Amino acid sequence: MIIPDINLLLYAYDSSSPFHKKAAAWWQASLSGTGPVGLAAVVIFGFVRIGTNPRVFQNPMTAAAAAGHVRSWLVQPVVQVLEAPPDHADHVLRLLVTLGAAGNLVTDAQIAALALDHGATVHTADADFMRFRGLRWFNPITGVASRRLPKSEGA
């Protein structure tokens, strides 16, 4: 299973991004492939939150357009919305404490915890995911993948 990060989904829909073509091709291949795609709620709503923000994009999506994209993903047979296990909040907090950081890593830690819980690989262009020990990740823009590090106590 793959779990996409918000940044790749935004690149796939932002034609002004230098990563647009690669991200769009990756996302289309992921949705039309046979491997499972897990969507985390934090990713779904992060896509809507950032994609509609005029402070982030010169031409942001409308709420209707962003919702339409999300709905088009959810009807794909390979897509499933991931359920967080009961200890998800504690797992995220342990990851953050282990890193000794929070701030901008809070969303990444939520995605990382779900990936670790589901044995999934995070697809991302965000190098911060390298900081989570034991996490498998892949950057479809560069083709670089993680070398799986042993899990730490926080994982």
Sequence positions of predicted segments:
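Extracytoplasmic
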Residues: F47
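Conserved glycosyltransferase catalytic-site signature
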Residues: I6, A41, L105-A109
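Ligand-binding beta-strand-loop-alpha-helix segment within the catalytic cores
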Residues: W73
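Structured helix-beta-strand junction loops
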Residues: G33-T34, Q76-P77, H118, F132
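Active-site neighborhoods of divalent-metal-dependent phosphate/nucleic-acid chemistry enzymes
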Residues: V78-H123
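Acidic, PIN/NYN-like endoribonuclease modules and their adjacent C-terminal/linker elements
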Residues: A112-A155
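Short beta-strand segments at enzyme active-site cores
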Residues: G38-A41, L82, T124-A125
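Short, well-structured N-terminal submotif of metal-dependent ribonuclease cores
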Residues: M1-I3, N7-L39, P54-G68, A145-G154
